[in-house]
Amino acid sequence: MIRLALKFALLATFCMGVCGVIEADEGMWVFDNLPLKHLKDKYGFEPAQAWIDQLRGSAVRFNNGGSGSFVSTDGLVMTNHHVGADTLQKLSTKEKDYYKVGFVANTKAEELKAPDLELNVLVDIRDVTAEVLASVPKDATDAAANAAKRAKMAEIEKAATTANKMRNDVVTLYQGGRYALYTYKKYTDVRLVFAPEFDIAFFGGDPDNFEYPRFCLDVCFFRIYENGQPAKPRHHLNWNTQGTKEGDLTFVAGHPGRTSRLFTVDHLKYLRDTSLPFLLDLLKDREAFLLEYAKTGEEKARQSKEDLFSYQNSLKARMGGYTGLKSPEFMASKEAAEAAFRKTIESDASMKEAYGDAWSKIAAAEIVAAKSLVKYNFIERGLGFESTLFSLAKTLVRHSAEVRKPNSDRLREFRDSALESLKMDLFSDAPIYPEYEVAKLTHSLQYWQSKVGANDEILKKALAGKSPADRAKELVAGTKIADVATRKKIAELAPEEIAKLDDSMIAIALAIDSAARAVRVDREDYVEAIETANYSRIAQANFRIKGESVYPDATFTLRLAFGTVKGYQELDGRNIPPYTTIGGTFAREQAHEAQEPYAIPKSWHDAKIAGRLKLQIPFNFISTNDIIGGNSGSPVVDKDNKVVGLIFDGNIHSLILDYGYDDKLARAVSVDSRAIIEALRSVYNAGFLADELTTSK
């Protein structure tokens, strides 16, 4: 944390959210507004439309939160082991723990069907800004305007879905400055092909997470099927078996989740002073609980391992961003950039009238957000009910009510265009472990009680006069919705029929639903609506001053980032070279006496002893590509659109990238394409898979 705090004195070149001229290799660019002139001016590279189309068409979105790419003509998709971890966990049993020991399908018949995995491939982007904004009545309040826009977005999505039978999402860009309809081809027959052991996919564990040097084979392969046969994608990426060298230009096509680079200073202060401290406390609590739970038995550790990784990863990432926001130098640079932008607006009477008070209105909204933060998170977001069974019950209760409303009046997750994906999750046959459910629910109820006190009215309703432990046992024991067939039957019931069910989880979901809906409405009307309206005004001001050469904040939609393979100098003076090697992994294991999480799997030692493993081959490398969470699994390609790497992490200095860009110290971390092929051939006896990657044209 000290290194993060010290580094912000160096951030004078950060993008402060209103930049117009591209600095360095900054930007997560939408594919219909790429920085082609900058690429040509700086690198002498001007991608042809065919190059853009191939990369866009090869990129895959994992709907559980990650990226991937087609890498063969037979529907083979590459991503990270940690993106595939959810599926690996769901496919695993006490007898076969694929998450731990890995998996290789030697034939297509051996590939394992993922229980509830949806992959999306972008096929079209259409600007619908005019349609969305035209739906807002004159003199509408911010809340009414937001409702009108949501209704229009639902209408656009439904019309598109009816016409093209694909997935259609209206995406809000520039915090409300632009709206675009993203159309995706959706795949739901997805099968596991290959995953390495956890101990090499995540070598170094949490201590090395967001650090560099790294030594990880964080890769996983799936295959998409259509009509029972391997899919034949229109586009895929070929493989560069020679890899990169320092200074090479690289590109990343992926789906960064969320950034806050366009946020106002007051909004960032809300994150720093209220939202992030709340979240960090929760993450620390959940991590401590899961660490203790894992100690109570090997099977319990297996069942909870992926959850533990997720919480630890989130905790480290959010702590890094929080440390950045706590830096006086960083916040001073944000304040200076905002002041300069506002001064430009104030100097023009028409712009002052149109946009001048947007910042103060956002500041007022954050005060409201702070007041509702605890209630909103515990009852609407469900942090007080950490339970898969409760989440399913809540979805069933709301599904019954929402689908009987006009499409435009529904909660967004229940609109017609989203229902197919929602039902895939709702009717997943992934295992649910009752004992783990009781433990999670007990702990989350206890944590909720510790934050609001035993006299909180909604908590009292949830506990029904019992202790958290007794109530959790009662709720898990008294529900039948762990059974998929039961969930399907309940999903057909009307609200009045659901209210008559004798099911504990359904009953508790019903009991708190009105309170949860109320706090959600307050959040949408008095926080999000005001933010959207006024960020839209700020975006319009920025467009008037600088045009549309500014990239929008990340929205888990397809973006292009570019950068070069480049080392850096640490704050303590150490020079960090861009590459690590396979041999370096064994040296790091020896330095840590092969203690977890620095124990290399036996398969790798066997390959080394047999002389098959080429230790000098580059394993991981770093580059200046602008990436964040959600980019995990993104392909790294060269100027020929060939795979040279696979994004899996950022270094510790990249954790501020949610709020601004830096290329002095921040780096993206990738698995080298050469290491992937070497591991497949020399460690896993999967030369057939290496051949598919390197010979597919």
Language model features with spans:
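Terminal presequence/propeptide segments associated with secretion/organelle targeting
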Residues: I2, A9, C19-K697
